[in-house]
Amino acid sequence: MFFWCACCLMVAWRVSASDAEHCPELPPVDNSIFVAKEVEGQILGTYVCIKGYHLVGKKTLFCNASKEWDNTTTECRLGHCPDPVLVNGEFSSSGPVNVSDKITFMCNDHYILKGSNRSQCLEDHTWAPPFPICKSRDCDPPGNPVHGYFEGNNFTLGSTISYYCEDRYYLVGVQEQQCVDGEWSSALPVCKLIQEAPKPECEKALLAFQESKNLCEAMENFMQQLKESGMTMEELKYSLELKKAELKAKLL
């Protein structure tokens, strides 16, 4: 025959009797040990659950200047570690767990597991590794690149969208992307401004050569007209000086 025995609150005071008397008596928390000590002029109390139980609520309490405990909603529940939780999934444990117990996780249909599919209850009342989550295999709406946009309104598993850029911009990255297990298949693309291409050096040289050629042809034509007119260079120079003087006089 087996009997269950509830272990009532055990209290250990590591402060002077006068300080301890100023703080009110705490309500009992079954299956726990409460240790109080003085820290920087305040009474600090800590709950520790016995083996096979885990803490729910606040672990550490302060007896403040008003000689009141700041919180008393604490309890020790059966099971060495907190009950496992997995939204949109299930796990192998069906009752209170003990130290070193292991559980496995599995997600419901249309959800994918993110994290480890196993976890173990440790001596310090924690699970390791942390519990996973079950994430929908559908995707969240994608973002728009700066100076760009996407086309498509279906974000479910297997659906595709296409990215485009505004006028005078070009796309850098993957244009068409697919929803795969809750994630888009590629990173968000970027829209970059189309820069006017600079003229090549050979084109610049060709332009300079053409201008020089045109200048030479103009000089040859001028010299030919001068020769045909019978005017000498001295007469041309004198004529230009007269024209210059006439223009200057008109400006005055």
Swiss-Prot record:
The lineage of its organism: Eukaryota, Metazoa, Chordata, Craniata, Vertebrata. InterPro entries: Sushi/SCR/CCP_sf, Sushi_SCR_CCP_dom. It comes from Homo sapiens. Controls the classical pathway of complement activation. It binds as a cofactor to C3b/C4b inactivator (C3bINA), which then hydrolyzes the complement fragment C4b. It also accelerates the degradation of the C4bC2a complex (C3 convertase) by dissociating the complement fragment C2a. It also interacts with anticoagulant protein S and with serum amyloid P component. The beta chain binds protein S. Its main location: secreted. Keywords: Complement pathway, Disulfide bond, Glycoprotein, Immunity, Innate immunity, Repeat, Secreted, Signal, Sushi. GO terms for cellular component: extracellular region; extracellular space; plasma membrane. Disulfide-linked complex of alpha and beta chains of 3 possible sorts: a 570 kDa complex of 7 alpha chains and 1 beta chain, a 530 kDa homoheptamer of alpha chains or a 500 kDa complex of 6 alpha chains and 1 beta chain. The central body of the alpha chain homomer supports tentacles, each with the binding site for C4b at the end. It is found in: Secreted. SMART domains: CCP (SM00032). It holds the Pfam family Sushi. Residues 1-17 form the signal peptide. Residues 21-78, 79-136, 137-193 form the Sushi domain. Disulfide bonds join C23-C63, C49-C76, C81-C121, C107-C134, C139-C179, C165-C191. It comes from the Eukaryota. GO terms for biological process: blood coagulation; complement activation, classical pathway; innate immune response; negative regulation of complement activation, classical pathway; positive regulation of protein catabolic process; regulation of opsonization; response to symbiotic bacterium. This is C4b-binding protein beta chain. Glycans are attached at N64, N71, N98, N117, N154.
